[in-house]
Amino acid sequence: MQTDTLSISQDPMGAAIRDFHLTGKAGRLRVLSSMFEEDEMPVAHLFRTFKDMPRTEQRALEEAYGNVLDIGAGAGCHALELQQQGKSVKAIDISPLSCEVMKERGVKDVECKNVFCPTFIGQFDTILLLMNGTGIAGKLSNLPNLLNRLKQLMSKDGQILIDSSDLKYIYEDEDGAFDIDLNGPYYGEVDYQMVYRNIKGEPFDWLYTDPTMLKAVCEQCGLKCEIIEEGDHYDYLAKITLTI
């Protein structure tokens, strides 16, 4: 697994976040993939407030307790809301530009760090991974590595709150059946590359995990997984705890 942070020259999302923070607007943050048509991420969405968050994210922030770690914190929308609720939160991200913006926006404890970096240590009661938190595993084969790493950072009575989506809807035919190649790669594995203005990021793997698969992998890792909120479009929020 990658353990380092991004260089500013290869941080398109961070550059877009910085522009929006400084000027209230940003150019197109393009999302490329070998599997889908080109898409665009609305940068304003990264600055959303509680009322504009999907119910899965709202529920995660409501459920968070104790010493909270927000992984992949982006522009800091979740960390800021937790602070407003009076909760203690540490925000980490691999984007130095995003981390600077979070500090300027008032997030009190920010560190530019990759969660897989061995020098990152701590014990947290709640670990948040939102906006498709399983994504950072990249591949299904790496999901146990992610979960085991989170176990190291979780207090004995702690919890992981992570969201994802089941991409099976992409393979649904007109009759409502799902045309998925069970002999091919796991259907939730995708690749992305982000481009902002003249800044092109490195291609990266991203993992969407269906609830049944997430529960099975959690069980392999000595963890219990419970789906506590379901969204409108195959998205969900899971609560993961240590198996007693």
What are these regions (language model features)?
Residues 1-30:
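N-terminal auxiliary segments of SAM/dcSAM-dependent transferases
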Residues 7, 15-20, 155-215:
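SAM-dependent methyltransferase
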Residues 44-67:
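Conserved alpha-helix/loop element of class I SAM-dependent methyltransferases that forms part
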Residues 75:
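Conserved SAM/SAH-binding loop
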Residues 95-96:
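Conserved SAM/SAH-binding beta-strand->alpha-helix loop
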Residues 106-117:
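Conserved SAM-binding strand-loop segment of SAM-dependent methyltransferases
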Residues 124-144:
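A short SAM/SAH-binding and catalytic strip from SAM-dependent methyltransferases
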Residues 143-156:
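A short glycine-rich, Lys/Arg-flanked "PGG" loop and its adjoining helix->strand segment in the class I
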